[in-house]
Amino acid sequence: MQKQRLLNVGFGNFVVAERVVSIVNPASAPMRRLREEARDQGRLVDATQGRKTRSIIVTDSNHVILSAIQAETIGQRFIQEENS
């Protein structure tokens, strides 16, 4: 059985690293539309614990995960997971 690596997206929430397609900044209009479409279709996971959304993670299953951690920070964690 293959060991799955987990990516910490903040506040005790984790995502399977192999399923991540992109980690993006939520400020642009296309990302806001992506978030609203995911919410309408039931594909949105809010992992912000009530805090401001600072990054959006898109998975290969087309789920959209909101995180209160900066996209750059999650990207660095992702790279560290890849190297370990």
Swiss-Prot record:
Pfam families: RemA-like (PF04025). It comes from the Bacteria. Belongs to the RemA family. This is Putative regulatory protein Dde_2720. The lineage of its organism: Bacteria, Pseudomonadati, Thermodesulfobacteriota, Desulfovibrionia, Desulfovibrionales.
